[in-house]
A protein has these predicted regions:
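Walker A/P-loop NTP-binding motif of AAA+ ATPase domains
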Residues: 43-238
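AAA+ P-loop ATPase mechanoenzymes
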Residues: 1-64, 79-80
Length: 239
């Protein structure tokens, strides 16, 4: 009896072995896994843009979400956000997405949306589903939810075309599937695009945040030069 009691007292439940995300990703060629190292304070951007990003992070803070859930305001306590970063190329959209991931202590699964199109009938639409199905499978297998980063998502987000050609129908069908997947998505998704002007209104309604990234002004350009030029480099006078 003493032995049985001792076993009960000292019983430790077996820890379920956590599957590493790297091992799951070995069997697929869709996503690039990124472990972010950039801090949001390392990025030179307009102050109002930084404030917007910091506000999103505060709203998505785990303690805040748990409190809202306990009050019955939020149905679950998971971090969920659908975000669009838009603006000219080279303005820090991807880098800011990685910085936000670091602040949320999340890995990033990055996908280059320019690879989605296929010359084969129906394959582009299947590829859209495959992105989200694979992401969902990774989340369920690894018991963690990395941020899904869709780079250059212009063809997903642009206004649907009113045409009867095969390519027009394929484009619209692909976007309809994307809309459906966005509607169901659970987690954090960030899509980057250079062209917000052509954004379909249906997509605009389904994203929680739309953040503009502008070209740096003179003050920010000066900060960039000062950050990356060697401190002890010899320059001509008044450089």
């Amino acid at each position: 009896i003493d032995e049985i009691l001792q076993r009960i007292i000292n019983f430790e439940p077996k820890q379920s072995k956590k599957i590493k995300i790297e091992s799951v990703l070995k069997d697929q060629d869709i996503f690039e896994l990124i472990e972010p190292s950039t801090d949001i304070n390392d990025i030179i951007m307009p102050e109002n843009t930084k404030e917007l990003l910091e506000n999103i992070l505060k709203q998505q803070d785990k303690k805040v979400l748990e409190r809202l859930h306990s009050w019955g305001i939020k149905s679950n306590k998971n971090i969920e956000a659908k975000i669009i970063f838009y603006g000219p190329a080279g303005t820090g959209k991807t880098m800011s997405a990685l910085a936000m991931a670091k602040s949320m202590k999340k890995s990033v699964l990055s996908f280059d949306c320019s690879k989605i199109l296929s010359k084969w009938v129906g394959e582009s639409e299947q590829n859209v589903r495959k992105i989200f199905d694979t992401y969902k499978n990774i989340v369920q297998t690894c018991k963690q939810s990395p941020i899904l980063l869709l780079n250059e998502a212009d063809q997903f987000l642009s206004t649907r075309v009113d045409g009867s050609s095969g390519s027009d129908k394929m484009h619209n069908q692909m976007q309809n599937i994307f809309l459906e997947q966005i509607e169901r998505f659970s987690g954090v998704i960030i899509a980057t695009t250079n062209f917000l002007e052509s954004l379909d209104s249906a997509f605009s309604r389904r994203f929680d945040y739309k953040i503009e990234f502008k070209k740096p002004d003179f003050k920010d350009r000066l900060k960039i030069w000062e950050k990356f030029l060697p401190k002890k480099a010899l320059f001509e006078k008044d450089f």
